[in-house]
Swiss-Prot record:
Belongs to the thymidine/pyrimidine-nucleoside phosphorylase family. Type 2 subfamily. SUPFAM superfamilies: Nucleoside phosphorylase/phosphoribosyltransferase catalytic domain, Nucleoside phosphorylase/phosphoribosyltransferase N-terminal domain, Pyrimidine nucleoside phosphorylase C-terminal domain. The lineage of its organism: Bacteria, Pseudomonadati, Pseudomonadota, Gammaproteobacteria, Pseudomonadales. Pfam families: Glycos_trans_3N, Glycos_transf_3, PYNP_C. It comes from Stutzerimonas stutzeri (strain A1501). This is Putative thymidine phosphorylase. The keyword Protein biosynthesis does not apply. GO terms for cellular component: cytosol. GO terms for molecular function: 1,4-alpha-oligoglucan phosphorylase activity; thymidine phosphorylase activity.
C-alpha cells in the first residue's frame, strides 16, 4: 500500500495532534479514519464526514476518508482511530501522537471529469489519476465514477497502454537480475482450475524463476491464494517473499501486501462488487501486476465456453490482440493460449477440495482429475519453452517427466515448507461437516455444466471463508449417468449455508442432461 514520507502537511496548515487508536474494522483497501464528533479538532478544523484527511505519524503520511462517531467506546475525544489497513500502513504503536489535517483535493479531478464526459485521456492524465488513486485521494464515489466511465466509453488500445503504464509507475517494481522470469495468469471465470499450484513447482523444479503472487477470492469460491492457504501461509513479508523466491525459484503467495500495483488494488475493490471487468481494465490490471513483479515472460490463459467469462473465439481473439499490443509496448514477452472453458477444471470447487485435487495430481494418484493434470502439463510445457535451452515442442514432455518423476512434488513440498507448511492429508481432507447430494433424474449423458451456477452454489455453501465448504463434482461433460447417480456433492459447515445452497440447486442444479450429440464442442488450443 502506498504511503508518503514527509514532515510538512500538504495543505500548509498546522496539524492537530491526537493519540493513535487501532479500530478493528476491515475496510478492504480503503483507508478510514475515525474522529469523535465532539472532539476539539472537529470543531476547530471543521472536519466533515467522508472528507479526505491527511494523517502523519513519525514522518509517514497517509490519506484517509473520515468517519465521525458519537460512541466514545470507538474513539474518545482525544483519539484518532484508524481502520486495520490504514493502521498497518503507518507501522506505529497505538497511543503515539498522530497529526491530522484537511487534505488537498486530488489534482487529477479535471481529468476525471473529462473521462466522465467521454473524452480520450492522454498519458499524463492517466498517470495523474493513478497517482491520486494510489495515494487514496479519491473518494469511493470518484473511484466508481472513473471505473464506470472507462467501462461505458471503452478505452482504446493506446489508453489501455497509458493506464497500464501508469499503474506500474505508481507502485514498486521488482528486478530479479536474471532472465527469463516467467509467470502465468488465467483471466478467470472457471471454477477449480488450480493449474498455478501445479505449474509453479514444475517450472521451479526445472530451474526457472517463477515468482507467483495470486489473489484471494472476492466473488469466486476460491482463489489460488485461498487454496494454497490450506497447505501453507500465503501472507509473507515482502523481504521474506523475495528471499524465498531466490531460494526455491518460485512461490505461491498472496499479492495483496506487496505494493506492486497499489492503484489496481484500490480499483479492484470497486470493480468486483459492480461485476465490472471491461477488456481494457482487465488488461491493465493483469499486465501491470506481472510487470511490476519483475516478470519478463508471461503465459496467459483465456478459457472460452458458454458460461465462461469469454464466450466466443472472436471475443477471445480480440482480447488476445489487445493483450499482445500492450505487452509489446511494455517489453513483456507474451504467449496467449485459448483453452476449453466449458466446465470446471478438476473435481473440487472450494479451498480444501481444490487443494486435494492439486496434491492428487502431484502424487500421481490414480484418483487425480485428468483434466487438471493435462491442462497443467500443457501450460507448464509452454512456459518451459520460454527457456532458450528448450526446443519448441519439447516443453510438454519435459513437464510430464518432472511431474511423473516426483520432482514437482518434491519442489512443492519445499515451497510449502518455506511458506510455513500446515498438515494436510489429501486422502482424508478436512471437509465441512454437513453435505447433500445432487442426483440425476434420468438415464442420460452430462451435456452441460454451468460454471457460474456451480460457483454460486459453492459460495452459498460457505466457500472460501469456510475452507472445507464447496462442491465436489462426480460427473463431467460427456459422461453417462443413470437415474439416481450423484452428479455432485455439496459441503457446508452451517445448517443455514446448507439450506441456501440446497435452495439454489433446487432452482437450477447447474448440470444439464441429454443425449451425446447435445454435448457442446469448442475449438481451442487445449
Amino acid at each position: 500500500m502506498t504511503s508518503i514520507s514527509s514532515d510538512t502537511p500538504l495543505n500548509g496548515k498546522a496539524p492537530v495532534h491526537l493519540a493513535l487508536r487501532r479500530v478493528a474494522i476491515d475496510t478492504y483497501r480503503e483507508n478510514v479514519a475515525y474522529l469523535h464528533r465532539d472532539c476539539a479538532a472537529c470543531r476547530a478544523e471543521g472536519f466533515q464526514a467522508l472528507a479526505k484527511v491527511e494523517i502523519r505519524v513519525n514522518g509517514r503520511r497517509i490519506l484517509a476518508s473520515l468517519n465521525l462517531v458519537d460512541d466514545p467506546s470507538i474513539v474518545g475525544c482525544d483519539e484518532l482511530g484508524l481502520s486495520e489497513d490504514a493502521f498497518a500502513q503507518l507501522g506505529a504503536e497505538a497511543g503515539v501522537p498522530a497529526a491530522i489535517a484537511q487534505a488537498e483535493p486530488a489534482a487529477s479531478i479535471p481529468a476525471l471529469h473529462r473521462k466522465i464526459a467521454g473524452e480520450r485521456l492522454n498519458r499524463d492524465d492517466f498517470l495523474a489519476i493513478m497517482r491520486d488513486i494510489a495515494e487514496h485521494r479519491y473518494s469511493k464515489i470518484e473511484l466508481t465514477a472513473f471505473v464506470v466511465a472507462c467501462n461505458q466509453g471503452e478505452l482504446d488500445r493506446e489508453e489501455v497502454f497509458f493506464l497500464t503504464d501508469a499503474m506500474i509507475r505508481v507502485g514498486r517494481r521488482l528486478d530479479w537480475r536474471e532472465h527469463p522470469v516467467v509467470d502465468k495468469h488465467c483471466i478467470g471465470g472457471i471454477p477449480g482450475n488450480r493449474t498455478s499450484m501445479l505449474v509453479v513447482p514444475i517450472v521451479a523444479a526445472h530451474g526457472m524463476l517463477c515468482p507467483k503472487t495470486s489473489s484471494r477470492a472476492i466473488t469466486s469460491p476460491a482463489g489460488t491464494a485461498d487454496t494454497m492457504e490450506v497447505l501453507a501461509n500465503v501472507e509473507l513479508p515482502f523481504e521474506r517473499l523475495c528471499e524465498m523466491v531466490r531460494e526455491e525459484r518460485g512461490c505461491l503467495a498472496w499479492g495483496g501486501s506487496s505494493d506492486l500495483s497499489p492503484a489496481d488494488d484500490v480499483l479492484i475493490a470497486v470493480e468486483r462488487p459492480l461485476s465490472i471487468d471491461s477488456p481494457g481494465q482487465m488488461v491493465a490490471s493483469i499486465l501491470s501486476k506481472k510487470i511490476a513483479a519483475g516478470s519478463t515472460h508471461l503465459l496467459l490463459d483465456i478459457p472460452i465456453g458458454p458460461t465462461a467469462k469469454v464466450r466466443s473465439m472472436a471475443e477471445a481473439q480480440r482480447l488476445r490482440k489487445l493483450f499482445e499490443f500492450v505487452a509489446t509496448r511494455l517489453g513483456l514477452t507474451l504467449d496467449v493460449v485459448i483453452t476449453d472453458g466449458r466446465q470446471p477444471i478438476g473435481n473440487g470447487i472450494g479451498p480444501v477440495l481444490e487443494a486435494r485435487d492439486v496434491i492428487q495430481v502431484l502424487q500421481n494418484d490414480p484418483a487425480a482429475p485428468i483434466d487438471l493434470r493435462q491442462k497443467a502439463l500443457r501450460l507448464a510445457g509452454r512456459m518451459l519453452e520460454f527457456d532458450p535451452d528448450v526446443r519448441g515442442g519439447d516443453g510438454y514432455a519435459i513437464a510430464r517427466d518432472i511431474l511423473d518423476s516426483g520432482r514437482a512434488l518434491k519442489k512443492m513440498r519445499s515451497i510449502i515448507a518455506a511458506q510455513g507448511g500446515k498438515p494436510f492429508d489429501h486422502n482424508h481432507p478436512p471437509l465441512a461437516r454437513l453435505s447433500f447430494d445432487v442426483l440425476a433424474d434420468c438415464d442420460a449423458v452430462v451435456t452441460g455444466i454451468d460454471n457460474l451456477q456451480l460457483a454460486r452454489i459453492a459460495r452459498l455453501a460457505g466457500a472460501p471463508k469456510v475452507q472445507g465448504a464447496g462442491v465436489d463434482i462426480l460427473r463431467k461433460l460427456g459422461e453417462p449417468v443413470r437415474a439416481g447417480d450423484c452428479l455432485y456433492r455439496v459441503y457446508a459447515d452451517f445448517p443455514a449455508d446448507l439450506a441456501f445452497a440446497r435452495q439454489a440447486t433446487e432452482r437450477a442444479s447447474g448440470v444439464s442432461l441429454g443425449s451425446p450429440e447435445q454435448v457442446p464442442t469448442v475449438f481451442v488450443e487445449f
